Amino acid sequence: MTNFRLNVLAYSVMLGLTASVAYAEPTNQPTNQPTNQPTNQPTNQPTNQPTNQPTNQNSNASEQLEQINVSGSTENTDTKAPPKIAETVKTAKTLEREQADNIKDIVTYETGVTVVEAGRLAQSGFAIRGVDENRVAINIDGLRQAETLSTQGFKELFEGYGNFNNTRNGAEIETLKEVNITKGADSIKNGSGSLGGSVIYKTKDARDYLINKDYYVSYKKGYATENNQSFNTLTLAGRYKKFDVLVVTTSRNGHELENYGYKNYNDKIQGKKREKADPYKIEQDSTLLKLSFNPTENHRFTFGADLYEHRSRGQDLSYTLKYQKTDPNLAEVDSRHTNDKTKRRNISFSYENFSQTPFWDTLKITYSDQRIKTRARTDEYCDAGVRHCEGTDNPTGLKVTDGKITRRDGSELQFEKKNNTAHSNGETYDFKKFIDTDKKVIEDKLTLKNPNDTWYDCSIFNCENNAKIKVFEGNYSYGYDGKWKEVDLEIKTLNGKKFAKIKDPTNKIKSILPSSPGYLERLWQERDLDTNTQQLNLDLTKDFKTWHIEHNLQYGGSYNTAMKRMVNRAGNDASDVQWWATPTLGYNFYDQPYTCATAYSWNANLCPRVDPEFSYLLPIKTTGKSVYLFDNLVITDYLSFDLGYRYDNIHYQPKYKRGITPKLPDDIVKGLFIPLPKNSNSKPDEVKKNVQQNIDYIAKQNKKYKAHSYSFVSTIDPTSFLRLQLKYSKGFRTPTSDEMYFTFKHPDFTILPNADLKPEIAKTKEIAFTLHNDDWGFISTSLFKTNYKNFIDLIFKGEKDFPLVSGGSSLPFSLYQNINRDNASLKGIEINSKVFLGKMAKFMDGFNLSYKYTYQKGRMNGNIPMNAIQPRTMVYGLGYDHPNHKFGFDFYTTHVASKNPEDTYDIYAKDKKQTDTSIKWRSKSYTILDLIGYVQPIKNLTIRAGVYNLTNRKYITWDSARSIRSFGTSNVIEQSTGLGINRFYAPGRNYKMSVQFEF
């Protein structure tokens, strides 16, 4: 086992807990009976008893309902019970106590589990046991959630430029009844994707609230200073005769997470050196609705709607392609605006049967229709205001007054007179030097346009009654010296609107207008990743005995279809149009109006453009079929086994309809599978034909995978205070379509496809020793090892010369490809303990101590580090609860060790010809303190508050540090100096507070 070090305090806590438990007085009831609940049961099981009886049922039913509710309101079913091996359960009560507002808060005080950071797109799933994102399964009410485009090549090419919302969607905390976190291979529960572990969300139900009452009302309001987030949650539950209903609606409004020193950094600095977090306005809305009908106590029908939307709008001021002004007084050109969205909608119907038959005690059939859209939209335009944007710059202040062009105060235009240049027909002026109303001369800020290029909008200018306009007449056809001249206007009606132009076409006549275009050009891109899933589940349970062995059998199956597709849109248009902007395209020599197709110059205002939809991947339909069987066998009071088996059949089908499916860019598929004919690069028809042939070829490449998963857990209780648990399980993840087919060709970064990828396999072996006592608590130590086989990873394959399209010399291209690595291995140790101090002394009644510790180390292909492994982490806890729950607090101390350079790996080191393959920017060790408390002054009111990072420690987490990219335009810093890294630091001291009314 890899060596590890615990500090003195950790040893003290461990020894104290061990001694306390070992010498605790035995209770009257035996404590060594294994739980009848399996440790890795499937996620969508129905309850074992009907809990929908109205309140006028007999007292036994009421007691039964209350018992079920209590078991669901504490962590790990009972906080004094020993934990199940490699499993943590967070209930709604626990999440409320910890003031969790997002998925990151769920695992704040869990060791060995962190959240993947994704820059402006917040979080993207979890990291467990050395793997992250798609290798950690996430589901809500039995439904798999959206996966990222997981190929590392796609991430580096596109995610690093902020063009895709390539993240895993989250969940609204206020709708959750329970979060089950499992560490290690876990495909019995979730099928494909459960390599490092799983996170399973279960939403609330009306039955959770309607205990001995027919209604429940709750209103909660909270605020957090770390991101100025305020939230409101309204929960309504009611029962009427055979119907019950639950509604939970939550809205959240805040802004970006305030990094350490947020208020002290210069807000004007832009680009990768920016130290202050980029500004975003973040909103989240969620509604959970469940309506149930109970014709009898043994039958229950439920309609559910789970609606979730997360929106983030702001500016990427750290964007590296941002135009950098050399003079702060210059007008702004543009900046990058973001408008990202994650939207999930799940409509479900379920039927539950509680009639005991020879085949089941409970039966549940569920149909779900889930639609998830993750969108990243970027708009590049200037929003600095009319007087400060280059496109609408008007420093002279010209405006239209009573249909004529005037100065900013409505007076006539004035220019600097030329000395000794008076003519009989008027004064000569230098039209390059404009005199403002304050007598200051503004030079070279106006444009003199040819008559044929100038149109006046008659809705703004005076075009009636033989109207005239004052213009510039030059001494020559060039230069700025000239005199005023009043000329006639010619009226034209184009597309139903009246416009005027100067009648005299001489090249000495010029119109006088501001030099800017008079509008703000906007370049926009909108990228959608859609995952639509329809799923049918059948889940059954049956308790029975064979000889003297008790069985808790769970079995069933599922059938699902999922369509995953990418849609990209892009275009140009204009906004903030000013009076001097060209109002019409005009007409040609034959007196025919120009159109956007025939005009000789492009105008973003008059000819907004929307490009045809395109995609980098073909839509993929996935059909999944699975059956599972799980049995919890209780042999004796001292021995039990959990046996699980699952079979999955997964079928990938590319779906392409010519002319309907968004087109793939030619360069992505050109010559991919079917080579281009020789000397065809210069023949567009040949290239187009080859592109279509390759698309058709990909669309016919169906892939089928079959997988067998299993799990074995043994629970042995040799004494009343000692428990030994052994676990061996297998998980898998099938390659995604983008991992197999994605390709990209560029001299700096060329991705080669690999259609021969095998499924990833994970096998976990774990042993846990637990000392426990019903009154004292528990201490559990586990050793684990996970072996990954066929681990998919992106590697640098070297350089290859490709001939240029134009012929002649060749150019070296850096080649990358996804491959199955021979193996990857991870091992580690975890400690989880909680001791209740009331047995030591009466005055300590209600106090508890807790300690968690995780250390893990892993390598791929022998000696390549796994970057997703978290540094050594420990969490100390001191808690108190009043006997009547009038008030309480929790004090947490979290210590995280430094990320050692030898435990990191830069995949671009070889490409950059570096001998040091470690990642340059890593997290240092840190210790943070959190204090959380609650008080219940009256029965219906609960006030919660917390102080986080109590000592105002400056630190960066490893997940934030590893999100820094070595190239790209987003999430980058100046690599040579480290300027910009403060943007990634965690918040300093911050506070949370919430108030909840319940009736």
From Swiss-Prot:
<dbReference type="InterPro" id="IPR039426">
    <property type="entry name" value="TonB-dep_rcpt-like"/>
</dbReference>
<dbReference type="Pfam" id="PF00593">
    <property type="entry name" value="TonB_dep_Rec_b-barrel"/>
</dbReference>
<comment type="similarity">
    <text>Belongs to the TonB-dependent receptor family. Hemoglobin/haptoglobin binding protein subfamily.</text>
</comment>
<feature type="repeat" description="8">
    <location>
        <begin position="54"/>
        <end position="57"/>
    </location>
</feature>
<comment type="function">
    <text>Acts as a receptor for hemoglobin or the hemoglobin/haptoglobin complex of the human host and is required for heme uptake.</text>
</comment>
<dbReference type="InterPro" id="IPR010949">
    <property type="entry name" value="TonB_Hb/transfer/lactofer_rcpt"/>
</dbReference>
<keyword id="KW-0732">Signal</keyword>
<feature type="domain" description="TBDR plug">
    <location>
        <begin position="77"/>
        <end position="204"/>
    </location>
</feature>
<dbReference type="Pfam" id="PF04886">
    <property type="entry name" value="PT"/>
</dbReference>
<feature type="compositionally biased region" description="Low complexity">
    <location>
        <begin position="26"/>
        <end position="58"/>
    </location>
</feature>
<feature type="repeat" description="6">
    <location>
        <begin position="46"/>
        <end position="49"/>
    </location>
</feature>
<keyword id="KW-0998">Cell outer membrane</keyword>
<dbReference type="Pfam" id="PF07715">
    <property type="entry name" value="Plug"/>
</dbReference>
<dbReference type="InterPro" id="IPR012910">
    <property type="entry name" value="Plug_dom"/>
</dbReference>
<feature type="repeat" description="1">
    <location>
        <begin position="26"/>
        <end position="29"/>
    </location>
</feature>
<feature type="region of interest" description="Disordered">
    <location>
        <begin position="25"/>
        <end position="60"/>
    </location>
</feature>
<feature type="repeat" description="5">
    <location>
        <begin position="42"/>
        <end position="45"/>
    </location>
</feature>
<keyword id="KW-0798">TonB box</keyword>
<dbReference type="InterPro" id="IPR036942">
    <property type="entry name" value="TonB_rcpt_b-brl_sf"/>
</dbReference>
<feature type="repeat" description="7">
    <location>
        <begin position="50"/>
        <end position="53"/>
    </location>
</feature>
<keyword id="KW-1134">Transmembrane beta strand</keyword>
<keyword id="KW-0812">Transmembrane</keyword>
<keyword id="KW-0813">Transport</keyword>
<dbReference type="InterPro" id="IPR037066">
    <property type="entry name" value="Plug_dom_sf"/>
</dbReference>
<keyword id="KW-0675">Receptor</keyword>
<dbReference type="InterPro" id="IPR000531">
    <property type="entry name" value="TonB-dep_rcpt_b-brl"/>
</dbReference>
<feature type="repeat" description="4">
    <location>
        <begin position="38"/>
        <end position="41"/>
    </location>
</feature>
<feature type="repeat" description="2">
    <location>
        <begin position="30"/>
        <end position="33"/>
    </location>
</feature>
<feature type="signal peptide">
    <location>
        <begin position="1"/>
        <end position="24"/>
    </location>
</feature>
<keyword id="KW-0677">Repeat</keyword>
<feature type="domain" description="TBDR beta-barrel">
    <location>
        <begin position="212"/>
        <end position="999"/>
    </location>
</feature>
<dbReference type="GO" id="GO:0015344">
    <property type="term" value="F:siderophore uptake transmembrane transporter activity"/>
</dbReference>
<keyword id="KW-0472">Membrane</keyword>
<dbReference type="InterPro" id="IPR010917">
    <property type="entry name" value="TonB_rcpt_CS"/>
</dbReference>
<feature type="region of interest" description="8 X 4 AA tandem repeats of P-T-N-Q">
    <location>
        <begin position="26"/>
        <end position="57"/>
    </location>
</feature>
<feature type="short sequence motif" description="TonB C-terminal box">
    <location>
        <begin position="982"/>
        <end position="999"/>
    </location>
</feature>
<feature type="short sequence motif" description="TonB box">
    <location>
        <begin position="66"/>
        <end position="73"/>
    </location>
</feature>
<dbReference type="GO" id="GO:0009279">
    <property type="term" value="C:cell outer membrane"/>
</dbReference>
<dbReference type="InterPro" id="IPR006970">
    <property type="entry name" value="PT"/>
</dbReference>
<feature type="repeat" description="3">
    <location>
        <begin position="34"/>
        <end position="37"/>
    </location>
</feature>
<protein>
    <recommendedName>
        <fullName>Hemoglobin and hemoglobin-haptoglobin-binding protein B</fullName>
    </recommendedName>
</protein>
